[in-house]
Amino acid sequence: MKKEAIILLNMGGPNNLEEVEVFLTNMFNDKNIITVKSSLLRKLIATLITFSRTEKSQEIYNQIGGKSPIVGHTKKLVEKLQNRVGENIIVDFAMRYTPPFVSEAIERLSDKNIEKIYLIPLYPQYSTTTTKSSLEDFEEQYHLSSGDAILVEIKHFFQNKNYNMAILERIKERVSLEEMSEFDLIFSAHGLPLKVIQRGDTYQLHVQKHISILEQMMQKEGMTFKNIHLAYQSKVGPMEWLKPSLEDKLREIKNRKVIIFPIAFTIDNSETDYELEIEYREVAHEMGYEEYRVCRCPNDSEYFVEALVDIYAKMR
């Protein structure tokens, strides 16, 4: 009997401190991240960046348990989605830069008589640096494996109602309806170099559209904040990136009570557990914030599971 498979794709994160170097090496060798045409030059750049950042990155991961939480959360999500769709559909996941890699997921499917593989990158908004990179990685390796299943892909899902309900649920976990009007809400998105957007990447537009959808949904749910903002985090290097930065936005806001939701991430990782929870909490404290609260990502929430069921159904 022919079967179908759902493969969830994400960037990954170190499963231990030794894998930090693997993570950085693979990420900065990605042609969608370092976009120079010469693979030799890209390798040189990747080596230099990895050498300069490994020790500092290991210190960061050491502060959040010695590893990224992304694989653990994803395993729970896969288990719940598998239970939801039933045993006739195989649900698995693969990471772009750390184990489990795409090659491992393909190997597990090799003797399962798969007719169609549904690829769902866990990035709500499309970007060449994330969605395109993950899809290309799977496509290239699957064709090298001589697989003959049909690959079906989705590019983004920020409009999905159940996914957005998962976001509202996470926000309501951190602040009650009664006290929302005392808080500013910041949707913090992972930043990108401005030149990526200028080349036609739709990420910034998708983030803006996503926030507009969420604002309409919050209004219907009676979720009223003092103000709602967009800011960008995680800038590295000297190039100009999307603005405003999260630090600048925190400095600009007059109200000293703030809720942060990481709008670009579906699964908690170092950018949420360290950068938002620890690093920017210290920044906010130094700025005199009375309240600084960070929402969890959807992770394995029931609404997110239902969103993935929706997405799969619409892809069929």
Swiss-Prot record:
One of its GO terms (biological process) is heme biosynthetic process. It comes from Sulfurimonas denitrificans (strain ATCC 33889 / DSM 1251) (Thiomicrospira denitrificans (strain ATCC 33889 / DSM 1251)). It comes from the Bacteria. The gene is hemH. InterPro entries: Ferrochelatase, Ferrochelatase_AS, Ferrochelatase_C, Ferrochelatase_N. It is found in: Cytoplasm. Catalyzes the ferrous insertion into protoporphyrin IX. Fe cation binds at residues 190, 271. Pathway: Porphyrin-containing compound metabolism; protoheme biosynthesis; protoheme from protoporphyrin-IX: step 1/1. This is Ferrochelatase. It catalyses: heme b + 2 H(+) = protoporphyrin IX + Fe(2+). It is an enzyme of class 4 (lyase). One of its GO terms (molecular function) is ferrochelatase activity. Its main location: cytoplasm. HAMAP family: Ferrochelatase (MF_00323). One of its GO terms (cellular component) is cytoplasm. Keywords: Cytoplasm, Heme biosynthesis, Iron, Lyase, Metal-binding, Porphyrin biosynthesis. Its EC number is 4.98.1.1. Belongs to the ferrochelatase family. PANTHER family: FERROCHELATASE (PTHR11108), FERROCHELATASE, MITOCHONDRIAL (PTHR11108:SF1). The keyword Metal-binding applies. SUPFAM superfamilies: Chelatase. PROSITE patterns: FERROCHELATASE (PS00534).
